[in-house]
Amino acid sequence: TLEEMWEIIDTSEQTQKHCMMMENVNYGREELLFLNMCRKKVIGDLLHAEAAYIHDLRDQMDDVKKRGEGLWRPYHLAKRNGNLYPTHGLGPVAQYMNLSRSEDQFNSIVSYSTPAIGRNLYAKEKHKEDHKWNKIDFKGGDLNTSIIKTNLGRTIMVQWDETSPRPYSRLNLIQGTKGTLAGFPTRVALQGGVPGATEDHHSWATGEQLETLYEKYDHPMYKRLEAKAKKMGGHGGMDFIMLYRMVECLIKGIPLDQNVYEGCFWSSVSQLSEIS
């Protein structure tokens, strides 16, 4: 809740202890590439972002006998209606925009959910009539879309869908006055074209066409840790980079990449979307 987030912030300040949301996707190669390109103004002034957590997790409803998310996650969908997991998509784009660390931050939000149909259908199709999932009327809409406006007038679309039959995506789109960067799959469109790949911004540079951009704009931290990350793994290495970086910051006494304010800042979208 919003009240509990303030308790976390107050406790961190009073005890002078770090509190970092371990949002691993901020350390993916694509996300670090986009962060570096945004910092270098490759796509100009930032205007709009699109973030999401789109992941069909209906099969977790089958894992009720295991010690896993299937034991508790569906209960949130049963009672709550909004964006129940905003940070996985929002974390990276919020950092691209440097929100909460500059003069800009969230100003307002409006949120809409589709009807809640998919979970009820899945329960009927996969489980017996007297199964516990068939005794619940799921309230959470299959897809939630929230639009955030920042103090500087920039916009962010955040979506959440753990029910629909569609491919995984976090969208990861950031749009500026000189181009757009987007994920799933990684693609780039620049005013005047991507050198050696496209002639103008009317087509995306993808796949092998992005090699020159990786060579030029790969984040210094990724370059430094790439070999170790590939060896250690963890969601493609992002888990390792996140853990390595957190320990590195603590040992060297430098600020963490995500602080307590950002963790609560991103998380607040969940309850605010429900209120909206």
Model segments located where?
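Rossmann-fold NAD(P)-binding glycine/threonine-rich loop
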Residues: 1-18
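Non-transmembrane alpha-helical segments in soluble domains
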Residues: 9, 35, 90, 94, ...
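Predominantly a Rossmann-like dinucleotide-binding segment in NAD(P)-dependent oxidoreductases
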Residues: 13-20, 25-137, 246
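Short catalytic-loop micro-motif centered on adjacent basic/acidic residues
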Residues: 19-23, 157-160, 259
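Glycine-rich phosphate/pyrophosphate-binding beta-alpha loops
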Residues: 140, 158-169
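Active-site beta-strand termini and strand-to-loop segments that position acidic
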Residues: 146-152, 176
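Short, mixed charged/polar active-site loops
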Residues: 155-157, 180
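C-terminal helical cap and adjacent loop that interface with cofactors, partners, or active-site loops
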Residues: 165-276
